């Protein structure tokens, strides 16, 4: 069993404060819970198990048992998980506050050891010091933490995590915060705690302490679309569906600038109990709009591209071509339920076909040209430096003509009305007959930016904001977008 979970279970009986703070879903009666998806460490009870999604941030970081309390490390309410969470720069003072909280909630002294020993020995055949019976006394104070970067903020979720070598399918990674503190001071704290234990337990305590305090930090992981659950969406089949978020709050709103001070609240039990008794939940509906989700969607589109359309003479738009084995697109994928992606695909293929027809003699769907290899990549605009490469390849294929030291290509083939409008909008109110490289880039990017302007998008979804940030955006009515009205970014 998880050491941290066991410690919470046994220490919860000590006093009123512990009974309130150390209440874990993993130690309570099991309730029906969502299915699990990934393996990793539950941030609430610190055990390595199968994880399900959090209703506060949509990340997979909570086990089936703890999910019943809907706790998130981004909450405002200073529950145990929130008090173990630190943000950005951790000072030595912040670490001292964390260690003091550990000492307050999980003390080890002669009186307590005797109390726990007597309790264990009340059971039959328990005169020996078997580790599984005293697991709660074998939790050393360490500076282990799981860390994740959300937008411009780095979060450290401290705790005692067993089985660090086990499989980790989450975006959180282990970091050793002992580098920010004095090793000798931490050693002294633990040796003092260890001195009250029987000899056989001291050996196990020391082994656990050194293995969990002398490890190398892991490299930071990058978030991906699959790290976020779809289960919080109002309608999973709608590409513009809002995400439902639940956050635990308190009546006296805490300032984000004092985020790292939450762990010091347990020093004053009466005040802490009053704060917790004022807790309530806030519900938010937030937009999916972010680079992470957009990159994922455009990546799927790029894999479904049928480049041969740009050599064809079909009268219909790219997605409406039927009975042509070279140009017909598979319309059964879920991604095509998004009208924005349909418009982007049709307009992009229409414009590239106009360029190809204006500058070459290719006129059949089955043509095998080198240009087709770069077409899928022109949809991957989220990383502009990489995107410039396939655009240059496309431009070179069009065999531009040098005019006064600058290269131009023709644009004299018919384009649809939407593309024409975008060209007029981005080319000073006209449709030019010749285009240079920058003009081609501007028009290609405008077709995507019309609906997904990644230049002004957050990297991660709004679900990763703190509760105070969500509250502030909600007051300004900026948590949702207007895509349900089919209004583009430009409009």
UniProtKB/Swiss-Prot annotation:
Residues 82-176 are annotated as: Important for cytoskeleton localization. A motif (pLxIS motif) lies at residues 485-488. GO terms for molecular function: metal ion binding; RNA binding. One of its GO terms (biological process) is symbiont-mediated suppression of host cytoplasmic pattern recognition receptor signaling pathway via inhibition of IRF3 activity. Residues 320-491 are annotated as: Interaction with host IRF3. Belongs to the rotavirus NSP1 family. Interacts (via C-terminus) with host IRF3; this interaction leads to IRF3 degradation. Interacts with host IRF7; this interaction leads to IRF7 degradation. Interacts with host CUL1 and CUL3. This is Non-structural protein 1. It comes from Rotavirus A (strain RVA/Human/Japan/AU-1/1982/G3P3[9]). The lineage of its organism: Viruses, Riboviria, Orthornavirae, Duplornaviricota, Resentoviricetes.
